């Protein structure tokens, strides 16, 4: 008997942004799905508009599993995780142990297939960068949603993420930001009316 998927199903019980007041709580499971949507889109944009040659479906899968180890480690708040390089380095080691523990929950004949999704050492540098871009973009989108709902708790997080996005900047991310991101600050009525035109 394997407990792998029973563990993954508990990602929905782990809340993100645990030290901040949220208008709407976000869990790791729904965050992972949004990161998969965005990473998939970034890969397609890169391929279609900027001469990329990425497997968009693989990118989506990598994004789906990118935070799977948090079912064991929990979601450590960013200010703590990146407080200094030593903490960040040690946390990476903890994540690696958690990834290995998840992999060992699988039947032996499936372990390699999932190791390639759970362990970022199996990602190409381009795949890793794209998933990190999507992850940061989704955190930024969360900030926009919270701010548009009147929650000023996310002002500093938004500023920090703008710096992160500037560092991870790419043509496909610029395209996504210009075409898709503005809608996240609009109401349902505004995006619905615009869609009917």
UniProtKB/Swiss-Prot annotation:
Domain HD stretches: 28-140
Q: Where does substrate bind?
A: 16-17, 31, 67, 75-78, 135
Provide a GO CC annotation, any one. cytoplasm
Name the residues annotated as site: Appears to be important in orienting the phosphate for catalysis: 16
Q: Which cofactor does it need?
A: a divalent metal cation
- KW tRNA-binding (keyword) present: no
Q: Which PROSITE patterns match?
A: HD
Protein residues bound to a divalent metal cation: 31, 66-67, 135
Q: Where in the cell is it found?
A: Cytoplasm
The UniProt family comment states: Belongs to the 5DNU family.
What this chain does, per the record? Answer: Catalyzes the strictly specific dephosphorylation of 2'-deoxyribonucleoside 5'-monophosphates.
Name of the featured protein: 5'-deoxynucleotidase YPTB2590
- The species this protein belongs to is Yersinia pseudotuberculosis serotype I (strain IP32953)
């Amino acid at each position: 008997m394997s407990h792998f998927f029973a563990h993954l199903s508990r990602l929905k019980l782990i809340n993100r942004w645990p030290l901040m007041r949220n208008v709407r709580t976000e869990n790791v499971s729904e965050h992972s799905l949004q990161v998969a949507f965005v990473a998939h889109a970034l890969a397609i944009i890169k391929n279609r508009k900027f001469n990329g040659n990425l497997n968009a479906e693989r990118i989506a899968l990598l994004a789906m599993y990118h935070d799977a180890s948090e079912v064991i480690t929990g979601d450590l708040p960013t200010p703590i995780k990146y407080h200094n390089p030593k903490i960040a380095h040690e946390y990476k080691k903890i994540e690696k142990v958690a990834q290995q523990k998840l992999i060992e929950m699988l039947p032996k004949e499936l372990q390699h297939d999932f190791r390639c999704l759970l362990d970022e050492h199996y990602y190409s540098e381009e795949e890793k960068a794209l998933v990190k871009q999507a992850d940061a973009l989704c955190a930024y989108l969360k900030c926009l949603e919270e701010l548009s709902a009147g929650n000023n708790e996310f002002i500093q997080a938004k500023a920090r993420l703008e710096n992160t996005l500037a560092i991870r900047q790419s043509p496909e991310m610029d395209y996504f930001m210009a075409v898709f991101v503005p809608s996240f600050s609009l109401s349902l009525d505004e995006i619905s009316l615009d869609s009917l035109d």
